[in-house]
Amino acid sequence: AALGPGRDLSSFDSAVRASTMDYLTTCLETAGQLGAGILAGPLYTGGGKRHWLSPDEKKREWMLAVDGLRELARRAEHYGVVLSVEPLNRYRTSVANTAGQVLRMVEEVDAPNVGVHFDTYHACLEERDLCAALEQVLQAGKVNHFHACANNRGAPGQGVIPWEDLLGLLVRYGYGGHITMETFALGGLDSSWV
């Protein structure tokens, strides 16, 4: 799901949260009708949300994201859709940047139809060790979507990402979900920013 400006389950503005829930519910309904089976992305907030918050505000933002995802998971179950929550790099959001943070978020949501969307581009910017980050969520049994993208937004093999190691981990842990190529043309805009 593309969540641009004004789409944010973690917003302190209840009207924004309600509007976002309505939008995501429409996405779930559409996914259900199409038989898509999964709704993936940074479902807790849109890109471009980078701000400093006090520790108390940060906890509140986190809980709003968790509560919103919990409600979204309940709705997703009605449509037979699984949620896959994607961490975004620090230049896109300040809510959840690493696979470990999203794993914690997913564990707090505590719904069987919610998992972690591992994106190699964002992970390359945020993780100290890509393989260790992926293995952490694989060990938890929570990876349910995988974006394959080079560190420069190109096709796999055009950058510095250790593809053989990452794919080896997916095989070793029996990952059976989709592997989606997410590449962008040189000079192109990220559609979620438009």
Task: Name the predicted role of every residue range.
Residues 35-37, 96-118, 123-194:
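Histidine-acidic metal/acid-base catalytic patches
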Residues 4, 75-78, 136, 153:
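N-proximal short alpha-helices
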